[in-house]
Amino acid sequence: CPEEHQILFWLAIHQEPVSILELKPDLISVITQHHLSDYLESLYLRMLLEKIENQHYFTMQPVLMEYVTQKLIITVTQELITGEFNLFNSHALMVATTKDDIRNSQIRKIINPIINSLLEQFKTQQNLEIHLKSILLQTKQKYPLASGYFKENLINILRHLPTNLKSDNFSDLTIGQANLQGINLNNVDFSNYHFKNTIFTQSLWVWAVAFPPVMQQCERPRSLISNCRSCNILL
């Protein structure tokens, strides 16, 4: 079923065994979240998944993992070419806050192959950059409050072209799972930008910080940015 396919794609993206608690927040569909354990059990009974570490973690066999990853690359590439987005919005192509070796593997096995496939279509990096930035602008104007991973996926692909983001306008966006390490962000417009699970080269100057009610339950942070996971930063 489509929901099981979505779960297989997520397991391919994580590239390591994950628990239900780790997998559930990734899903944008509330219905899929609610029935996640049932879908995982169904996949396991059909021998499409493996359980490890006392049955609490799920993954795929290497051959299936490679097949699903290739399917992900082909599907996302086609969506970016045609402008009809489904998988590109429902799944984060890279988990910015995961371990360094996993994140590097996601870049090598998912992000870079997508970029290479797109370059075959658009011929030059400049043409591809123009196409991707136009998609980001159109989406921001038409669907400013849309949920999903569309915007962070675009930023992660632009970041690994590599391209120059100086003076670009990313205002009024909500972005999670973006890797901005090693990028020159001088004069980039991040006004009214909601950062979530995003990593940077170095600390930011913070002009305004919004603390949710659960902040009172957190240990008093040494740093406003890094030590309270439930705190969101609004610039």
PLM regions: where:
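Amphipathic alpha-helical scaffolds
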Residues: P2-L45, K51-H56
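Positions within the helices of HEAT/ARM-like alpha-solenoid repeats
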Residues: V18-S19, Q106-I110, A146-F150, N186
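Leucine-rich, amphipathic alpha-helical/linker segments
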Residues: P62-E66, K71-K133
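WD40-repeat beta-propeller superdomains and closely related acidic/aromatic-rich repeat-like regions
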Residues: I175-L235
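Short beta-strand "wing" residues that participate in macromolecule-binding interfaces
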Residues: E50-K51, L80
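Minor-groove-contacting beta-hairpin "wing" of winged helix-turn-helix DNA-binding domains
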Residues: H56-P62
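LRR N-terminal entry segment and analogous cap-like coil->beta motifs
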Residues: L136-N187
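Core register positions within helices of long alpha-helical scaffolds
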Residues: Y39, S117, L154-H160, Y193
